[in-house]
Amino acid sequence: MSNQDSWEDFCEQSELLPGEFLVREAGGAFVAVYNIDGLLYGVEDVCTHDGGELAGGPIEGFSIECLRHGAKFDLRTGAALCAPAHAPVPIWAVRVTQGKVQVRPR
């Protein structure tokens, strides 16, 4: 079985209400899962500009801003939306199964 097929338990669904996020270690990386209006999005918790954490940065629509230097990323695709970041942030697949939020690398 490849890593792409391996889902990991991340949290209970009840721990991640709309407007909230959680950061946990999964698959050897720190992953942030965001609940935006009931939809879940997962990204590695690292700015590709300088390696800082993304979690806790302001969210507007589907974009998150790094608090360190203002780089923005699309939570749906991982795309860098503005300088100083140019490389996308790795995204993680997220699903809910039997009340558990699960993640895996894409």
Language-model regions: role of each:
Residues 1-61, 75, 88-106:
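N-terminal pre-ligand scaffold of iron-sulfur
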Residues 47, 66-69:
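Short cysteine clusters
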